[in-house]
Amino acid sequence: MTTFNTNDDQIYPVERGLELQPIMRQVYVWMGFGTLLTAIVAYFTIKTSLINLAANPAVMLGAVVAEFAMVLGLSFGFNRLSSGMATGLFFAYAALNGFTLSVVLLAFSVGTVISAFAATAVLFGVMSVIGYTTKLDLTKMGTYLMMGVIGLVIVMVVNLFINSGPLDMIISIVGVLIFTALTAYDTQRIGRMAAEMNLEGDAVAKLGIFGALKLYLDFINMFLFMLRLIGGKRR
């Protein structure tokens, strides 16, 4: 049986077992493949007639709802899903995300997309290494970061109506900062889960997918806010 240390009142530094490094390697590999799949699907969608389908509001709404359902299924179905089902859901989500992101990417120049991706990759890499190696306990950051995400979404909705340029810039900066911090937080959380779990069979592969999803979401959201920050929209 897979068990977790659920004592949130006192969380001490965890001595990492020999199994931790291979699991983290799995996390990064799956996340990398997921990101690559997203990029391939987005490119294919933009270059084909699929972009017309992606631009359809009804289709886009259905795709977004499906994405939300997949994330919930992966996040809350850890103990119920097999590793094969979890892997399939993760890659289905990554592919569908490429389809929905194609419309967003089309609004920016190629140079802007490349610059934003490069900046995001460097920032993500640095913060993930920090989260993995730091001796500081980042646990308490989680609540504040989630509150920050909720507040950010609310402000973004408000700005849809007032369409403020300066506020949009602030939103972009804050968004990058929040998901930069979440990258370190989630990396440490995944590492601690790996060290605290009694790893048996399927649980190892499932943790790799679960961790990959967390870091994939951090990376994609950081990338989107970086795009907004750098700008360079096509006229």
Description of each model-found segment:
Residues 1-235:
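A hydrophobic alpha-helical transmembrane-helix feature that marks the membrane cores
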